[in-house]
Amino acid sequence: MASTTTRRALLGGAAALGALAAGAGFAAAGRKKGHPVMSTPAITHLPPPRRVERVLRASSEHWVGDGFRVKSVITPTGDPRLQSPFLLLDHAALRRFEPATERRGVGEHPHRGFETVTFAYRGEIEHRDSAGGGGIIGPGDVQWMTAADGVVHEEKHSRRFTEQGGDMEMVQLWVNLPAKQKRSKPGYQALLDASFPRLQLGAAKARLIAGALGRERGPAFTHTPMTVFDLAFTETGDAELELPKGFTALLFTLEGELRSAEQASSLAPGQLATLARGDSTLVRLSGAAGTRALVLAGEPIDEPVVSYGPFVMNTQAEIVEAVRDYQSGKMGHLS
């Protein structure tokens, strides 16, 4: 995300991009219907569960524009050995907004070289971009925007949410693209809550957004192999699941306290655990009723990562090119 003022700073020179360390897009959706819940059998005869390798705590809260008060848990400058292909995770924790006449949010700003994934848990966000994507995401919906060769976009509270006020909670994830796809055509997926398969994993219900879990597959298209889902514990107990061998695996607690097998302490809200890769595919989690978490697993991208504000490429020369392309209007404009 970046403000309109920041856009003018960008036009004035590449150095201003250093202030754009956070940002992405929200986008279209619709309303939801119920979805059947599939049960998966207990996992047996597997190696010991994957252990927690590191626990990361979120940064201090900061405003992105005037509409999103977020904490960053991982950033593009983090260790790719722990987080690749994931670049950034921002959590806008539950916050009440009073009714207003002026829409809050973030003005137009660019991206190149990666994807932004926005999970709307509460509230409504309106998005539009220079590639033609746009619309509203509401509670339970997900937007998957592929910036790739470059887009300019904005995201603001929807008009209805602005006028009525209400609670808002969002997560925004940045996903890296391999070098061969960083200059591909931008894309946009509006994923409705009703499109996500539900699976019962012991004491928790999973909502599958991308990749495979058990016999189910999520509706999101991904450029590299990954599995993305959230968990909600419907009762106090354990949840067992399998993630592909060798994948990066991240656990982020949204609400309550989450515990991984063999972990001495629980993950508090806003904390993220990285799991050791190793040979095991088994992940065993426990939580009390009401605990919510986001689970991210992806095949690492073994390539250099060079980030500069809203651009993530492989070399410094590509960053310079991205800045010039944006300044010259090659990434488009919002009408």
Region roles according to the model:
Residues A2-S335:
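Jelly-roll (double-stranded beta-helix
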